[in-house]
């Protein structure tokens, strides 16, 4: 008698199939690595897909220079332990402008350092397929995105011009200059991600676990004081309001644009229990998602992840 796969094993098998399919179909794929929990799961699945061999493609981190310090330390640790072929790209135009989320705002900062930075890297290395860790349950525009998300020669996404995906059949044919973004975790939920991390004991950035951290409330968002740069952009009143609180992060990005949540969950089982009870989206803490109605879809149309 054949044992039935659990839903996590079914999701795992589906994701591994997608990763292998892309590696077979495309000439120069790359895996985007944002250092977050979804990237950790996607990287784990990719290593499983080609074990005992090495990944047949590099991993790409589009750096904004404003990630949490713990994320940078974790990235270097993973590269060292796993022997990853890591490419790091920072938009030189953004560096020249001293781009930051305080002076230029979240929308401009994200466009220059993330969207344009990603497009530069994809063009520079000639990648024709890029794996991303987005899931359909995260946000409305992502809910309607295909597993194979086709982009034109300028990396733009047209939601009205996407191919049908029947069962596990994917059409990877692209014209010269076109590319695709591939989302192997499309059908996973946030709870699935955490349960799989627990099941597989996947290492993740410690920021996901609750700890006493210095925070300041900015426009209703609890922002962690990660380094001294932020202090020069705070008013005297805001500096005076800095305090310590038990918080953790459900999602990670540029630290001034990522809100912490009050929590006492210090272990994976406690995080899973918290996920079973929560009724809010993990991306409620992402400032860039609140720029304007439909802002995420517009970002994706311009070439965002």
Curated annotation (Swiss-Prot):
Recorded name of the encoding gene: cysD
Catalysed reactions listed for this entry: sulfate + ATP + H(+) = adenosine 5'-phosphosulfate + diphosphate
Gene3D superfamilies assigned to the protein according to its UniProt record, in alphabetical order: HUPs
Gene Ontology MF terms in the entry: ATP binding; sulfate adenylyltransferase (ATP) activity
Enzyme Commission number, as recorded: 2.7.7.4
Keywords per UniProt: ATP-binding, Nucleotide-binding, Nucleotidyltransferase, Transferase
Organism of provenance: Stutzerimonas stutzeri (strain A1501) (Pseudomonas stutzeri)
Name of the top EC class for this enzyme: transferase
Summary of the function given for this chain in its UniProt record: With CysN forms the ATP sulfurylase (ATPS) that catalyzes the adenylation of sulfate producing adenosine 5'-phosphosulfate (APS) and diphosphate, the first enzymatic step in sulfur assimilation pathway. APS synthesis involves the formation of a high-energy phosphoric-sulfuric acid anhydride bond driven by GTP hydrolysis by CysN coupled to ATP hydrolysis by CysD.
Keyword hit for Transferase: yes
GO biological process: hydrogen sulfide biosynthetic process; sulfate assimilation
Entry annotated with the keyword ATP-binding: yes
Entry similarity comment: Belongs to the PAPS reductase family. CysD subfamily.
Subunit structure: Heterodimer composed of CysD, the smaller subunit, and CysN.
Pathway(s) annotated for this protein in UniProt: Sulfur metabolism; hydrogen sulfide biosynthesis; sulfite from sulfate: step 1/3
Name of the protein: Sulfate adenylyltransferase subunit 2
Domain of life: Bacteria
């Amino acid at each position: 008698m054949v044992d039935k796969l659990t839903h996590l094993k079914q999701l795992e098998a589906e994701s591994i199939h997608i990763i292998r399919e892309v590696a077979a179909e495309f000439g120069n794929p790359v895996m985007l690595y944002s250092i977050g929990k979804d990237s950790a799961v996607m990287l784990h699945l990719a290593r499983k897909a080609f074990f005992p061999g090495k990944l047949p493609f590099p991993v790409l981190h589009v750096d904004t220079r404003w990630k949490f310090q713990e994320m940078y330390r974790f990235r270097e640790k993973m590269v060292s332990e796993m022997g990853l072929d890591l490419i790091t790209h920072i938009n030189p135009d953004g560096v020249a402008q001293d781009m930051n989320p305080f002076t230029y705002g979240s929308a401009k900062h994200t466009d220059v350092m993330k969207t344009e930075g990603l497009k530069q890297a994809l063009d520079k290395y000639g990648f024709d397929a890029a794996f991303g860790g987005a899931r359909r349950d995260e946000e409305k525009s992502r809910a309607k995105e295909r597993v194979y998300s086709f982009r034109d020669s300028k990396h733009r996404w047209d939601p009205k011009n996407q191919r049908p995906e029947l069962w596990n059949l994917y059409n990877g044919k692209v014209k010269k200059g076109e590319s695709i973004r591939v989302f192997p975790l499309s059908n996973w939920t946030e709870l699935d991600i955490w349960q799989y991390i627990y099941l597989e004991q996947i290492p993740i950035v410690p920021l996901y676990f609750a700890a006493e951290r210095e925070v300041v409330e900015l426009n209703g968002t609890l922002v962690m004081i990660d380094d001294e740069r932020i202090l020069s952009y705070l008013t005297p009143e805001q500096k005076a309001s800095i305090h310590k609180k038990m918080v953790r992060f459900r999602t990670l990005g540029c630290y001034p644009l990522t809100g912490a949540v009050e929590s006492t969950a210090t272990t994976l089982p406690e995080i899973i229990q918290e996920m079973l009870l929560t009724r809010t989206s993990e991306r409620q803490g992402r400032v860039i998602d609140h720029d304007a109605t439909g802002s995420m879809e517009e970002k994706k149309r311009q070439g965002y992840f």
